[in-house]
From Swiss-Prot:
It comes from the Bacteria. Residues 600-637 are annotated as: Disordered. The gene is dnaK. This is Chaperone protein DnaK. It comes from Methylobacterium nodulans (strain LMG 21967 / CNCM I-2342 / ORS 2060). Residues 621-630 have a biased composition (Acidic residues). Induction: By stress conditions e.g. heat shock.
Length: 637
């Protein structure tokens, strides 16, 4: 069995770790960084870029650079959050045939799972490069407040990337695993996780290697991206006030504002003021325009105060559900890059009444926890038991559109619960089971996970048939539902796949595309390498012809020129084999030149060689040594 890796698939950045013996290790990527931007881009010629290379070109290619894609995963196009996101990103968000939110570039649609898979592939390659062996299994983290559709879509992303996802683990729980691995003390901890796109808070009880989640709460559309957007809105408003030009209508300018906003936000965690300079941000009839302004930490805090306050209500709910008060929390662990912001640390300190623990790296702790869980599943990590919970209540729609709960939120998973229902009308021979997830009293106000029909119910007065509905939630938080007619024993089981979601056929198609893309990337790399080799050979040969051309016959020189022209022509194309063949031809043609160069370096023959040797002999000078007393030398110095 190969190594199982732990991956934190983040909104802004992703990270991969692995267990080395009893210690988790974060793996650096090809660029030497410990985290990788969760950004995927497609260039003019169709090349796919992932991570830092994609981020670097975002300003000049905004409509084909996909970032914060995690905010769309498992969401429908009509979801209010999707519609909100449409106004915030420069790329196209489109409606897929199944009603899901997908993204598009150059007329081609991609599911968020597919884009996420490209990032996961990069993580997989990073691990394989470090371990020196293929990696096929992983533990992937998700926000604790992700619903079933979002969890399933994340699992699909892993499958598309060529990974068997052994476990989906909640981010705050992973952070708690990393935090508590080496600590033998017991107690109640709160994990406050504010990342790039999502917010979670979990209350856990730790003791004797048991990590028991008591409650979880959060907001899957609150994170660093929103903080960046507040700065972008402020910069655009200030520029419009001064120059009368609306930068939000210009995709390129908007991308530059976004990059500047992220940089300013990071700087304001350590500095009290930062300067934003964006020369040539736009132009009008009067000429180019530049943006230059100072942003203080106090101003930034006022711009985002409501966002920070939005994290407090989930904290209150989590404490209430766990049945503990803030002063009963022994330690508050901060996770996610946004928790570096001093104001957030102050708010957390005020709410919980204690200084938050800053001993973990907020960008890496989740991946480390995922690696620990991978180690548990692999048998490398002993005496660790993880008990997680389902974040949202699960139930079905019953008469009058009421949401009838079968499993309450914060129930420890895996879990199974059954309840018997009946028909609403006389002689009803089929029932539609509509499965929802959420906390509202009416089914329509909650998230529809999926629906199915149980048919062939024998005719009977209403209320007589007994239909047993069973909910089964696995350790990944993914739901299976069974409906059984107790009279006939007829059963219908579905693994919840939202009315949207990817079908098995679509997943297989995307897996094949990912494999084809990997092959295409390899071909592209090979093309670049043979082109570089060909161009280097032309340069070296032309230089040699200038220096030693008079040492070879005109016929040989003509042959070299013809071979250079043929290779140049091949380099203008994309055929690797042709370039290789023409490169070999040029190497053959220039062999005579090589012989001439070798002869020239040997001199004009044996006599010249002998003369040179004699000259060298005559040049030898006898050394005249003089002994210097060490003490004497020191005195002179």
């Amino acid at each position: 069995m190969g190594k199982v890796i732990g991956i934190d698939l983040g909104t802004t950045n992703s990270c991969v770790a692995v267990m080395e013996g009893t210690q988790p290790k974060v793996i650096e990527n090809a660029e030497g960084a410990r985290t990788t931007p969760s950004i995927v881009a497609f260039t003019d010629d169709g090349e796919r870029l992932v991570g830092q290379p994609a981020k670097r070109q975002a300003v000049t290619n905004p409509s084909r650079t996909f970032f914060a894609i995690k905010r769309l995963i498992g969401r429908t196009y009509d979801d209010p959050m999707t519609q909100k996101d449409k106004g915030l990103v420069p790329y196209a968000i489109t409606r897929a045939g199944n009603g899901d939110a997908w993204v598009a570039a150059d007329g081609k649609q991609f599911s968020p799972s597919q884009i996420s898979a490209f990032t996961l592939q990069k993580m997989k390659e990073t691990a394989e490069s470090y371990l020196g062996q293929p990696v096929t299994q992983a533990v992937i983290t998700v926000p604790a407040y992700f619903n079933d559709a979002q969890r399933q879509a994340t699992k699909d992303a892993g499958k598309i990337a060529g990974l068997e996802v052994l476990r989906i683990i909640n981010e705050p729980t992973a952070a708690a695993l990393a935090y508590g691995l080496d600590k033998r003390k017991s107690g109640v901890i709160a994990v406050y996780d504010l990342g790039g796109g999502t917010f979670d808070v979990s209350i856990l009880e730790i003791g004797d290697g048991v990590f028991e989640v008591k409650s979880t709460n959060g907001d899957t559309f609150l994170g660093g991206e929103d903080f960046d957007n507040r700065i972008v809105e402020y910069l655009a408003a200030e520029f419009k006030r001064e120059q009368g030009i609306d930068l939000t209508k210009d995709k390129l300018a908007l991308q530059r504002l976004k990059e500047a906003a992220e940089k300013a936000k990071i700087e304001l965690s350590s500095a009290t003021q930062t300067e934003i300079n964006l020369p040539y941000i736009t132009a009008d009839a009067s000429g180019p325009k530049h943006l230059a302004l100072k942003l203080s930490r106090a101003k930034f805090e006022s711009l985002v105060d409501d966002l920070i306050q939005r994290t407090i209500e989930p904290c209150r709910k989590a404490l209430k559900d766990a049945g503990v008060s803030a002063n009963e929390i022994d330690e508050v662990v901060l996770v996610g890059g946004m928790t570096r912001m001093p104001k957030i640390q102050d708010v957390v300190k005020t709410f919980f009444g204690k200084e938050p623990h800053k001993g973990v790296n907020p960008d890496e702790v989740v991946a480390i926890g995922a690696a620990v869980q991978a180690g548990v599943l692999q048998g490398d990590v002993k005496d660790v038991l993880l008990l997680d919970v389902t974040p949202l209540s699960l139930g079905i729609e019953t008469l009058g559109g009421v949401f009838t709960r079968l499993i309450d939120r914060n129930t420890t998973i895996p879990t199974k619960k059954s309840q018997v229902f009946s028909t609403a009308e006389d002689n009803q021979n089929a029932v539609t089971i509509r499965v929802f997830q959420g906390e509202r009293e009416m089914a329509a106000d909650n998230k529809l996970l999926g629906q199915f029909d149980l048919v062939g119910i024998p005719p009977a007065p209403r209320g007589v048939p007994q239909i047993e509905v069973t909910f089964d939630i696995d350790a990944n938080g993914i739901v299976n539902v069974t409906a059984k007619d107790k009279a006939t024993g007829k059963e219908h089981q579905i693994r919840i796949q939202a009315s949207g979601g990817l079908s098995e056929t679509e997943i297989q198609r995307m897996v094949q595309e990912a494999e084809a893309n990997a092959a295409e990337d390899k071909k592209r790399r090979e093309l670049v390498e043979v082109k570089n080799q060909g161009e280097s050979l032309i340069h070296a040969t032309e230089k040699s012809v200038k220096e030693y051309g008079d040492k070879v016959s005109e016929a040989d020189k003509a042959g070299i020129t013809t071979a250079i022209d043929a290779l140049r022509q091949a380099l203008a194309g994309e055929d690797v084999e042709t370039i290789k063949a023409r490169t070999t031809d040029l190497m053959q043609a220039s062999m005579k030149l090589g012989e001439a160069m070798y002869a020239a370096s040997q001199g004009a023959g044996p006599e010249a060689g002998a003369d040179q040797a004699q000259a060298k002999k005559d040049d030898v000078i006898d050394a005249d040594f003089q002994e210097v007393d060490d003490k004497d030398q020191k005195k002179r110095a």
